[in-house]
């Protein structure tokens, strides 16, 4: 998982911040996956590795399509809290697609889209 998480940093020819990697592994509860290959991890663990990979470079905008779709309720809540913390800590904007109303509750603004049209919104 480690190589997967740091790949964007390596591709950008940046130095790897080991503290940052360790913080993500711990926050997403995947420390035990550090030396595992994808086939050795559950779907939920793979999803959290993908989220860590998205967060490692601290982009100003994160696009997340069903980021908790393959996770159990506890893991989904952990990921939601991590995304919220990252957005606050690094002043990131997160654009998220979700069908999970509980996950949507973490948002500052919610748009409801039906058949490609905005049909409602909260906090807009």
Language-model segments: what does each one mean?
Residues 37-41, 45-47:
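Conserved ABC ATPase signature
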Residues 2-10:
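Short helical segment in ABC ATPase nucleotide-binding domains corresponding to the A-loop/adjacent helical element
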Residues 51, 79:
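Hydrophobic anchor residue at the start of the ABC signature
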Residues 62-65:
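Catalytic Walker B motif of ABC-type/P-loop ATPase nucleotide-binding domains
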Residues 73-75:
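Helix N-cap at the start of a conserved alpha-helix in ABC-type nucleotide-binding domains
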Residues 36-39, 57, 90:
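Conserved signature/switch motifs of ABC ATPase nucleotide-binding domains
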Residues 16-33:
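Conserved ABC ATPase "signature" region
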Residues 2, 34-37:
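Signature (C-motif/LSGGQ) region and adjacent switch/coupling loops
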């Amino acid at each position: 998982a480690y190589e997967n998480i740091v790949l964007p940093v390596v591709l950008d020819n940046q130095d790897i911040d080991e503290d940052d990697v360790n913080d993500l592994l711990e926050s997403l509860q995947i420390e035990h996956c550090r030396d595992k290959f994808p086939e050795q991890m559950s779907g939920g663990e793979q999803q959290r590795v993908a989220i860590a990979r998205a967060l490692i470079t601290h982009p100003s905008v994160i696009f997340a399509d069903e980021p908790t779709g393959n996770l159990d309720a506890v893991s989904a809540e952990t990921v939601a809290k991590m995304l919220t913390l990252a957005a606050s800590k690094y002043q990131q904007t997160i654009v998220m697609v979700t069908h999970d109303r509980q996950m949507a509750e973490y948002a500052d603004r919610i748009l409801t889209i039906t058949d490609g049209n905005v049909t409602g919104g909260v906090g807009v």
